[in-house]
Amino acid sequence: MKLKITKLVPIIAIGVQMSHYSIAASTETSSWDNVTTPLIAGVGHENHRGAAWCDYDNDGFLDLYMAHFGAFDPDGLYLGSPNQLLKNLGDTEFEDVTTLELEANSGLSHHPAWADIDNDGLLDLFVSQSSNNGTEHSILLRQDSIGVFSDITDGEPLQLGGLLPRGIGWQDINNDGLIDLLVAVSNGDAMQNRMLINLGGGSFIRQSSLFSDEYKEGRSIGWCDYNNDNLPDVYIANGAEDHCDVSERTNQLFKNLGDGVWEEVASEAGVAETGHARGHVWGDINNDGHMDLFVGNQKGSDTGGGFNRLFENNGDGTFTDITVSAGMYASFRTRCVSMADYDNDGFLDIYIVNFGGALPPNHLFRNNGDNTFTEVAIGSPAVGGSFNGAAASWADYDNDGWVDLYLVGGSINAPGIGQNQLLRNTNQNGNHWLEVELCGTESNRSAIGARVTIKHIKSGQGLVTQMRDIQSGTGYNSQNMLRAHFGIGSSTTIINMTIRWPSGVVQSIGGILPDQIIRVVEDEDTFAFDCNRNCVSDLVDIAEGLSQDTNGNAIPDECECITDADADINGDGSVNVIDLLIIISNWDAEGSSEGDIDGDGIVGIQDLLLLIGAWSDC
């Protein structure tokens, strides 16, 4: 049976726009709407630190968790500020649904990251938090039912009490189907990172021999299979200050040799950067099938920054520093770096978040497709301007196929400086796109660590191959949406899509139409779509009677938003103006004419009323 691929949720019409900027630098144009409201900005919360997109309630709309660090008290200590969970209402508005547990006010928050730790279909949340007095700690919140969270931190090893945990990254390192957690630590206990193994039932144990032998100041974690051997590797950015020994800020790349054996290979791979790293990000910038690496650096003054580094993956386990030739060689004071294809042309672009008392601007670089980048907007409000940034997270929050950008400000200065911003992407240039959401069955339910690869024919380029990883933590104190987003330019058909799951299962399908969001369930035998989001194949739902398929198109009725299948005269999944025109063209016709919804032998007023009652133009 041929499957028809359907949108996960309908495309949303966008409402009121607060402000609009269209910026040109050289010949480049970038267009964004600043749709920030006081709620989204985090007004009333001081010194923001991180943000994580998720769909905690499984309604198909991406929600936002904001981590706040706090402000100084009269004694010079930071006071924690309650974190917030904002529910996406689906109409470009958000609602604060924060509960006492979600405030996570047990410490000074850094990095939030979502993952389904118990594979129950509900995302859970870990927030790394530091302490002023040694009693505050990090927190793990399990989602017991939609919107109901329990604190299951329950002491060590999860609390990380007395430490300064920074970046975190979820990954199933032992391939048991349970997601594990690596935490970068930048102080205390010999500054050793923490590898926490998920035992199930909400319990974790520290595996002390992994990623913690050397004294480093860990800042960010990035899991990625950089050598394409189907084993997850990890890069750790270490960011000590000038007064510290250079060895404490040498970044690390741990190569996974299998069977629980790891080898630190940063020097031989050419990525042992020592420039006060904060954030880093993996991505295939040139679509050659190898993941490249961008590292953001900073120095301890507002006037001079570390040079960020762009490393091209050579495909043989080594990297080449192409920072200069790529046009990325500039001195910034960078906290967060990120990649996304904001213009849907098929190439990953780079966004840089800078910070400091001098309020250096953020920067957006457009990928030219030839291993070079062009700066789109210099210090422009369209990309966040100058606001002492802390983090940046990408997500298609309005489900229109164009990734939007949430910026986290880190200032405790005057009101309005350093407030968070939500920038809606309005760079609609006619390019096509595809978004893929995954649900693991043998693998961890969140599908973190999965790799999605697509192939399509693009005019002037021939066969193009693109790949995206599902990542839990990226950049610095950030989590992008757990969807794979592809811009495909002018291509109108995706010839093939392959999903390589963490379990080793590989799924493949051909002939996918663009401009839609699809959800796929891990399955060895079939490419299983999951439009109703229950992590069961639509075909299984229909076969077992869990869903109805009135028109026999292999799509559950609840996914077609029609209440009367007979009113969908042309069978396209919607009752709309096309069906109305069919009725009009056959008005008063007798016999078995198209448009006779009630089956009384004539097309007339009763059929029109039935059509109006079932109207669902979606």
Annotate each predicted stretch with a short phrase.
Residues 39-52, 100-113, 156-169, 210-222, ...:
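Repeat-based blade/solenoid architectures
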Residues 54-61, 89-90, 115-122, 144-145, ...:
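Calcium-coordinating acidic loop motifs
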Residues 40, 378-389, 393, 397-528:
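Gly/Ser/Thr/Pro-enriched helix-cap/hinge segments flanking short amphipathic alpha-helices
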Residues 24-34, 73-97, 135-152, 190-207, ...:
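Beta-propeller blade repeat segments, especially FG-GAP/WD-type strand-to-loop junctions
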Residues 42, 72-78, 129-132, 185-187, ...:
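Short consensus segments that form the blades of beta-propeller domains
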